[in-house]
C-alpha cells in the first residue's frame, strides 16, 4: 500500500472478503474464485450445462465459471472464453485475452466460435466500479448489452443465456429485451452473492 494506511472502507472490504465462507471454501477446494459457487447454484436450479456443449464465457478471468463448466460439459465439450485480464490456462478452454468492447476482439472471438452451435452464452462481466451508481450502472449496462448482442450472433435456437446484471437504471428495459428473445426468463440472486451487492443473475432459456 506504498506506506499509506488503508481507508476504512477498503479495510472493511478486505475483512469481509477473507471472512466470507465462500472465499474460504474456494481456497480450500483450490477454486479460482467464489464465482464458482454462484454458477453451481444456478446449475442446480436451471440445469443449463450438459455434456458435449459449446459455451461462450465473457468476463472469464480468473476462470471460476470456466473451471466449473468444464466439470459439467466433459471432454467433448468446448469453452470459448474472453477477458481483458489474463487467465491461467484451463484444459478444454480456448481463451482470448482482449477488450470485448473492441471490434477487433469481438471479430476474433466470433472467428474462434466459427460454425460451432453455441448452447450457452454466459457473462460475468463488470466494469471497474467507481462507487458512483450514476457512472457505474451505465457502464455495466453497456457490457450486458454487448453480451446480449453476442447471443444474437452465435446462440443456437433453444440455447441459454446467463448474465450478471446490476440493478438500477435500464434494468427493466434490458429484462424486457431478453424476454422478447427467450421463452423462459428468471432473475436469480444466489446465496453466494453478497447480500448488499446490486448484482443479480438473469437466466434465460429457450432462445427463440
From Swiss-Prot:
GO terms for cellular component: cytoplasm. It comes from the Bacteria. Gene3D superfamilies: Vaccinia Virus protein VP39. S-adenosyl-L-methionine binds at residues 63, 65, 83, 99, 124. Pfam families: FtsJ. This is Ribosomal RNA large subunit methyltransferase E. The active site is at residue 164. PANTHER family: RIBOSOMAL RNA METHYLTRANSFERASE, RRNA METHYLTRANSFERASE 2, MITOCHONDRIAL. Specifically methylates the uridine in position 2552 of 23S rRNA at the 2'-O position of the ribose in the fully assembled 50S ribosomal subunit. SUPFAM superfamilies: S-adenosyl-L-methionine-dependent methyltransferases. Keywords: Cytoplasm, Methyltransferase, rRNA processing, S-adenosyl-L-methionine, Transferase. The keyword Cytoplasm applies. Transmembrane segments: none annotated. One of its GO terms (molecular function) is rRNA (uridine-2'-O-)-methyltransferase activity. It catalyses: uridine(2552) in 23S rRNA + S-adenosyl-L-methionine = 2'-O-methyluridine(2552) in 23S rRNA + S-adenosyl-L-homocysteine + H(+). InterPro entries: RNA_methyltr_RlmE (IPR050082), RNA_MeTrfase_FtsJ_dom (IPR002877), rRNA-MeTfrase_E (IPR015507), rRNA_MeTrfase_gammaproteobac (IPR004512), SAM-dependent_MTases_sf (IPR029063). It is found in: Cytoplasm. Belongs to the class I-like SAM-binding methyltransferase superfamily. RNA methyltransferase RlmE family. Its EC number is 2.1.1.166. It is an enzyme of class 2 (transferase). The keyword Iron does not apply.
